Amino acid sequence: MTDVIIIGAGVSGCASARELARYKADILVLEKEEDVCCGTSKANSAIVHAGFDAAHGTLMARLNVEGSKRMPALARELDFAYDPCGSLVVCLQEEDLPKLQQLYENGTANGVEGLRIIRRDELKAMEPNISDDAIAALWAPTGAIVCPFGMTYAFAENAAKNGVRFQFDTAVQKVYPIQGGWRVETDRGSYDARLVVNAAGVYADVLHNMAAPAQPMQIIARRGDYFLLDHTAGDHVRHTVFQL
């Protein structure tokens, strides 16, 4: 019986694999695609959130802040691209200033460091191409972006070097409890493990409902569009910019 099976080789699965590789354990990662970072992790904005918008007291709030603090050291250790560009939440109307203040107070309560509300002149100095309608912004210097591919590959490579096994082109079909652990049935056979980590991205609810049908959950996925610009446009926007 395997000690741990991780389902999904995206950034969450590969990061979990790397962390668990610190211990004496037999760890297997199952991935339905042909390589790591082929699902949700390959198609996202790669933002390291500062943690100002997560509801205070939630696990997301705590992990946003903790993850943001840990990211620079991880990037140096594993040699993946990390840009501490900071983030701005831009306010376009005077009547929305109280919302900006609430966001600042929520972030401060969450422990986000360096938060400030800046006015038009400072905002224009930081982002010369920002809309003339912008009147203020919440500045979060701990916000950043990473390369999602490089980060995921770095986690996976480090995990593999420390004994974690990866099996690709293996789609999980069933997960259910057995004596002393769990059975994971796939299109390439069955695997038993003492523990299972569900890191299946937008399909994590499907696996959860297999394992715990009495406590069903549903992930409501969202899809966005990306515009690929020429590299000469790289300085047009200097920070991660959100609209309030």
Tell where the protein language model's regions lie, with residue ranges.
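Helical element adjacent to the flavin cofactor pocket in flavoenzyme catalytic cores
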Residues: 138-195
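Short loop/edge segments at beta-strand edges and connector loops
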Residues: 31, 84, 118-120, 168-170, ...
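Flavin-dependent oxidoreductases
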Residues: 15, 175-244
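N-terminal Rossmann-like FAD-binding beta1-loop-alpha1 element of flavoenzymes
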Residues: 2-29
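Conserved Rossmann-like nucleotide-cofactor binding loop
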Residues: 12, 35, 203
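Dinucleotide-binding Rossmann-like beta1-alpha1 core, especially the glycine-rich loop
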Residues: 46-126, 135, 244
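Redox-cofactor binding/interface segments in oxidoreductases and associated redox assembly factors
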Residues: 7, 50, 198-199
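Glycine-rich FAD pyrophosphate-binding loop
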Residues: 21-43
